[in-house]
Amino acid sequence: MAKKRHILCPFCFNGFNNSEVEYQCENMERDSNGEYRCERDIDYNFNTHWKVEGTQVRHIFTPKKGFFSSFTGPSLEQEKSDRCGYPSRRFGCPHCHNWVPSNMIEEGSEIISVVGGPASGKTNYIVALMHQLRKYGHKLRLQVTPQQVYRDNHPEESTQNLFKNKDNQLFKDYQVLNKTAVEDTTQRIPWIFQLKHLDTKKTIYLVFYDTAGENFNDESSVSNNVKYLQYSEGVIVVLDTLSLNKIQEIIKSKGLSDLSDISTPIEDTGTTLNNFISNKAKELHKKPFAFVFSKFDTVLNNARDMGFSTDAFFDGSSFADSSYINSGKFDVQKIDEISDTIKGALCEYWNDGNEADFVSGAEANWGDNHKFFGVSSFGCMPSDAGELEEVKPYRVMDPLVWILYKLGGFDIQTINEPKKK
């Protein structure tokens, strides 16, 4: 008998109890004419979700429920299809009828979401983050698993396959990942990674959409594009360092980079995000928010020109990467120091009238439940052709590890405090 849990569908983001889960028939046998022995259905719920017509999918059926299941939890055992009698244990969302992985149904589906405006570097960041987490996660006893979530008959859309392709492009071919076209309005599959602590068994899911980014100039667009945001236990907001006016001025004066693809200004992000949360998801003010400035190597390598103190980032004569990569322990004081340094720059030298307001708004809305981070997905600036001499991600895991530390249950051991369970 499984524990009764509330589930959030990774496709439509409607909630349901796992006792309400539907089953999809797993019978793949065909008759002499090549037809499935368990006839496929043109499913209204599935087709409505994907905005298509006539797509045939596996037969979905409601399992038999015992009288006490509503009190004790669902069995989640194999059930025989009501059409062909084939034993199945493949679960489907009762709302959109998409396949939901069994571990989500059994263990729950708490999520951390990653959002960011167009050209913020969100896709490059998530690939670098997952690459580093798979490489160093064992130091924190964390296991990361890309999920096999995809539309029926489209396994190429799974997180595992999509991530592998982009990981190879970035870390083997040394090529910046292609930008997603802003006009691409395709209903996309979310990237979903399961994060699990090997000792406490605490599980959470990192959810990310490989789209052109949320339009933070428009609250209705945020509401439509990031419906999952309001159900998140924590949020990583990717901000483009190059979108800051003062940074743009300095970069242009040095001729360092083409700024034609800068992201949404942070003041627009702050205003729209705050309005969305205040109107539709007030509980998010109680959840940890990591404001992550991407492409931060631009600042660190030109700190003197940008009026930025690098003391919080240096260890002797070189930039210090995250402490847990070597020690397995999280340096809370270092995270505080970095956050305070970035906030100080936003309020002073980088302030162009709006940056300080963004900081004060974050402090008013989230208090101790927010931090600022500076990360680099590449560790260097790419060429105009998008080529990289090497790829050495810098501090990309910090925002996620900090959120896990704040949430508790992941046994994140620290240098400065007693370990927090």
Q: Each PLM stretch: what is its role?
A:
Residues 67-74, 183-197, 201-235, 242-250, ...:
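Switch II of P-loop NTPase G domains
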Residues 355-382:
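Beta-strand-loop-alpha "switch" segments that mediate conformational coupling across diverse proteins
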Residues 13-16, 212-214, 241-245, 296-299, ...:
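Conserved nucleotide-binding/hydrolysis micro-motifs of P-loop NTPases
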Residues 197-200, 223-365:
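Conserved C-terminal guanine-recognition region of P-loop GTPase G domains, centered on the G4
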Residues 104-105, 134-178, 416-417:
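Flexible phosphate/Mg2+-sensing switch loops adjacent to catalytic phosphate-binding sites
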Residues 121-122, 334-349, 379-418:
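Conserved GTPase G-domain signal focused on the G5
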Residues 1-105:
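Long, basic/Gly/Ser/Thr-rich N-terminal segments
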Residues 110-136:
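Glycine-rich phosphate-binding P-loop
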